[in-house]
From Swiss-Prot:
Gene3D superfamilies with a match to the protein in the record: P-loop containing nucleotide triphosphate hydrolases
Role: Can catalyze the hydrolysis of ATP in the presence of single-stranded DNA, the ATP-dependent uptake of single-stranded DNA by duplex DNA, and the ATP-dependent hybridization of homologous single-stranded DNAs. It interacts with LexA causing its activation and leading to its autocatalytic cleavage.
Classification of source organism: Bacteria, Pseudomonadati, Pseudomonadota, Gammaproteobacteria, Chromatiales
Protein name: Protein RecA
GO biological process: DNA recombination; DNA repair; SOS response
Keyword DNA damage included in the entry's annotation: yes
Subcellular location: Cytoplasm
Native species: Thioalkalivibrio sulfidiphilus (strain HL-EbGR7)
Length: 343
């Protein structure tokens, strides 16, 4: 490319970034992808790597959608657990009225400190979310789910009444209000969403998410989560194999995907990921069925290796640190300085 065109392109890119914010446009191979965005881990090592910044970005809107029982709420509860481990505060706006505190506790959530709201209407749910964001004291706000945000007019109306586009208008208005507050308070807001089928679609994907198009536009990250298989121990099913696609990502290159296991009553199998990614990266050696690290055998078969790492958390931490160093961009000195100044 000649010099004049290069200058014109860099001027255009600069103008786009000034007008629409950092990350509005980037080169696909750009590994420096907005390094200074703070992130909260998802609880899955593979997904943190696929997201490019080590987790979900703070000060942004995130949408997680998928079919029923695909792991949407499990993933968000893991994010809450990770946030609390870092000393953060989390809130769960339970529009579905289906949060199970016992299950949340098993995933590592401190339910005593978790703020929970079970609103009556969609307007109330989004107003509560907005007030929590504006307080500036909450790190993560989860809305479960967009499909359950029922407009007040629909609740007060008769069962057969048609309320066309009410929910979409509600979401559009709420997100217009929320976005600026979210950026200012540096809060991560996660909307869980369900899938619906478009009628009469002959070609292309008939699936769509509820609540209109506003959330698709306002979300910086959109995750499509699917169950791909079952994990069995003998005849007993002990968990799900899960795949997450990063459908949209404004803070790093998109379209990456992560595969991990969700074990019933335990959540995302972090140690299983450490072993799998460690083998891919050559950090953990696999010879036949045996796994070894630094010449030391850690188990025959993945289950035994996982048990060994559970008993030796310092070794698991060391392997995970090496994996993160290899895949995730190093934080810039400027971001570290800002963080230490805040502390």
């Amino acid at each position: 490319m000649d010099e004049n065109r290069k200058k014109a392109l860099s001027a255009a890119l600069g103008q786009i970034e000034r007008q629409f914010g950092k990350g509005a446009v980037m080169r696909m191979g750009d590994s420096t992808a907005v390094r200074d965005v703070e992130a909260i881990s998802t609880g899955s090592l593979a997904l943190d790597i696929a997201l490019g910044i080590g987790g979900l970005p703070k000060g942004r809107v995130v949408e997680i959608y998928g079919p029923e029982s695909s792991g949407k709420t499990t993933l968000t509860l893991q994010v809450i657990a990770e946030c609390q481990k870092q000393g953060g505060t989390a809130a769960f706006v339970d529009a579905e009225h289906a949060l199970d505190p016992g299950y949340a506790e098993k995933l590592g959530v401190n339910v005593d400190d978790l703020l929970v709201s079970q609103p009556d209407t969609g307007e109330q749910a989004l107003e509560i979310a907005d007030m929590l964001v504006r307080s500036g004291a909450v790190d993560v706000v989860v809305v479960d789910s967009v499909a359950a945000l029922t407009p007040k007019a629909e609740i007060e109306g008769e069962m057969g009444d048609a309320h066309v586009g009410l929910q979409a208008r509600l979401m559009s208005q709420a997100l217009r209000k929320l976005t600026a507050n979210i950026k200012r308070s540096n809060t991560l807001v996660i909307f869980i969403n369900q899938i619906r089928m478009k009628i009469g679609v002959m070609f292309g994907n008939p699936e769509t998410t509820t609540g209109g198009n506003a959330l698709k536009f306002y979300a910086s990250v959109r995750l499509d989560i699917r169950r791909t298989g079952a994990i069995k121990k003998g005849d007993e099913v002990i968990g799900n194999e899960t795949r997450v696609k990063v459908v949209k990502n404004k803070v790093a290159p998109p379209f990456k995907q992560a595969e991990f296991e969700i074990l019933y009553g335990e959540g995302i199998s972090r140690l299983g990921e450490v072993i799998d990614i460690g083998v891919q990266d050559g950090i953990v050696d696999k010879s036949g069925a045996w796994y070894s690290y630094n010449g030391e055998r850690i188990g025959q078969g993945k289950d035994n290796a996982r048990t060994f790492l559970k008993e030796h958390p310092e070794m698991a931490g060391e392997i995970e640190r090496q994996i993160r160093e290899k895949h995730l961009p190093k934080r810039s000195a400027k971001a570290d300085e800002a963080e230490s100044a805040e502390a």
